[in-house]
Amino acid sequence: MASYVFIRVSKIRKGYFPVLLAIGFAITFAEGFILFLVNFGAIPTNGPTIQLVPQIIMQNPNPLIRFYGTLILLCFLNTIVLSIFYATIAKLLPKFSG
């Protein structure tokens, strides 16, 4: 969706839409995969680290709350990363516009 909106509001060629969409999906998948692995203990984080998902979510006995809480945090993280990515593309826009 973000890729489509970006293409519509910018003067970038429509041929780049699948590329931007694929990059967006790859970023989302990588963020989600790492976030879930770290929070569910598959990747050890030896020592004190920034906790990606707050304890109030992870200590909840309801698995749906743990899942959706993590998913909401992933959405915020994804918004930030894709905003930076699209801002970088917009800065390079004169090279891509046609």
Swiss-Prot record:
Keyword vocabulary terms for this entry: Cell membrane, Membrane, Transmembrane, Transmembrane helix
Lineage top rank: taxon: Archaea
Transmembrane parts of this sequence: 15-37, 67-89
Compartment(s) where it occurs, according to its Swiss-Prot or TrEMBL record: Cell membrane
Record-level GO cellular component terms: plasma membrane
Membrane topology: Multi-pass membrane protein
Protein name: Uncharacterized protein AF_0097
Organism: Archaeoglobus fulgidus (strain ATCC 49558 / DSM 4304 / JCM 9628 / NBRC 100126 / VC-16)
